[in-house]
Swiss-Prot record:
BP-aspect Gene Ontology terms: positive regulation of translational termination; protein hydroxylation
Enzyme class: oxidoreductase
GO annotation, cellular component aspect: cytoplasm; cytosol; nucleus
Role of this protein: Catalyzes the 2-oxoglutarate and iron-dependent C4-lysyl hydroxylation of ETF1 at 'Lys-63' thereby promoting the translational termination efficiency of ETF1.
Subunit structure: Interacts with ETF1. Interacts with the ETF1-GSPT1 complex.
Name of protein: 2-oxoglutarate and iron-dependent oxygenase JMJD4
Keyword Ribosomal protein in annotation: no
Protein's cellular compartments: Cytoplasm
Cofactor: Fe(2+)
An example molecular function term from Gene Ontology annotations: sequence-specific DNA binding
Main location, first listed in the record: cytoplasm
EC code: 1.14.11.-
Gene designation: JMJD4
């Protein structure tokens, strides 16, 4: 991040604090970025991160990736032989697209060898099977094979706090491989923690249906539930979906092989594989969508508290139990969110102390200064939140208010001429 881009981003957020503006109606079409050499990190910040809008990058951005060279046949189809030789005995998670479990699909685990055997038989049977349409989803290949030459992280997505945090703990990540036959799909959803995501088709094509933040509310049924499938004729039933006519049309994207889709924070979407497809997908959070993550966590806690409100007066340590339930349902609670902020903050404070000024998109002075500013805003809101004040922070180091003071001093120092 250069100085001019940081100034623009700081100015954008100065009036917002931890508020999250809506996007409103989807734009008429998705922007297409064709030339890597003509599109900078600053361009991405101005055009897409700040306004929280989607875009598609051309296949030129991924042409050097190892996965595109080795996982794909000359005809552009999945290279099953290579995948079997390299990963055949790896156990992978597989979803059944034909079975609805709440608003998702149930998963089973099998070896990649067994899944590819199924996939081949599915193709040979005219894309049909008594087992249904199975879709390999959420395979942590990069976590399990960290030295594999699979992809090169695009510079636009290099500020990735989620994976920076989980890499520091060395227990998990939010980098996934998806692979499935034509007709496999992912139901309507928004990404975890209201993160950004990027998705590259190593081979095959996808159809995306995207709705900007807030538009999903008009799609809820009369019970308040979001739809499982936004293409279902049931949405036309005005008795079941009384507000559906208020929903704007989705933004549609047909993503070709090699192309990269940027999905903004909080955009609900549904994705269909039009061909036999392999994709690489990352979820990521940084200073540009941190407030969205924080608002989402507050909403999740409120939902938990409402669900168990009848035990509020009778259950000892009710607030603590709500945090436990929240972590079980959402993958994180207020305590872990503080540790997430702390890990990123301490790394950025170190950069600022070393005054490692540099241009570009790397973790230099300007990027660290912007990050510290955003963490300060959100941490101040977290520290002031009544439910965080009930969390036992006696073992935290540093104490939340101490870290907040360090950050405020760093913000003042970074702003000094």
């Amino acid at each position: 991040m250069d100085r001019e881009t940081r100034a623009l981003a700081d100015s954008h957020f100065r009036g917002l604090g931890v508020d999250v503006p809506g996007v409103g109606q989807a734009p008429g079409r998705v922007a297409f970025v064709s030339e890597p050499g003509a599109f900078s990190y600053a361009d991405f910040v101005r055009g897409f991160l700040l306004p929280n809008l989607p875009c598609v990058f051309s296949s030129a951005f991924t042409q050097g990736w190892g996965s595109r060279r080795r996982w794909v046949t000359p005809a552009g189809r999945p290279d099953f032989d290579h995948l079997l030789r390299t990963y055949g005995d790896v156990v992978v998670p597989v979803a059944n697209c034909g079975v609805q479990e709440y608003n998702s699909n149930p998963k089973e685990h099998m070896t990649l060898r067994d899944y590819i055997t199924y996939w081949k038989e599915y193709i040979q049977a005219g894309y049909s099977s008594p087992r249904g349409c199975l879709y390999l989803k959420d395979w942590h290949l990069c976590r399990d094979f960290p030295v594999e030459d699979v992809f090169t992280l695009p510079v636009y997505f290099s500020s990735d706090w989620l994976n920076e945090f989980w890499d520091a703990l060395d227990v998990d990540d939010y980098r996934f491989v998806y692979a499935g036959p034509a007709g496999s799909w992912s139901p309507f959803h928004a990404d975890i923690f209201r993160s950004f995501s990027w998705s590259v088709n190593v081979c095959g094509r996808k159809k995306w249906l995207l709705f900007p933040p807030g538009q999903e509310e008009a799609l809820r049924d009369r019970h308040g539930n979001l739809p499982y499938d936004v293409t279902s004729p049931a949405l036309c039933d005005t008795h079941l979906h009384p507000r559906n006519q208020l929903a704007g049309p989705p933004l549609e994207i047909t993503q070709e092989a090699g192309e990269m889709v940027f999905v903004p924070s909080g955009w609900h979407h549904q994705v269909h594989n039009l061909d036999d497809t392999i994709s690489i997908n990352h979820n990521w959070v940084n200073g540009f969508n941190l407030a969205n993550m924080w608002r989402f966590l507050q909403q999740e806690l409120c939902a938990v508290q409402e669900e168990v409100s009848e035990w509020r007066d009778s259950m000892p340590d009710w607030h603590h139990h709500c945090q436990v339930i929240m972590r079980s349902c959402s993958g994180i609670n207020f305590e872990e969110f503080y540790h997430f902020l702390k890990v990123i903050a301490e790394k950025r404070l170190l950069v600022l102390r070393e005054a490692a000024a540099e241009d570009g998109a790397g973790l230099g002075f300007e990027q660290a200064a912007f990050d510290v500013g955003r963490i300060t805003e959100v941490l101040a809101s977290l520290v002031a939140h009544p439910d965080f004040q009930r969390v036992d922070t006696s073992a935290f180091s540093p104490q939340p208010k101490e870290l907040l003071q360090q950050l405020r001093e760093a913000v003042d120092a970074a702003a000094a001429p």
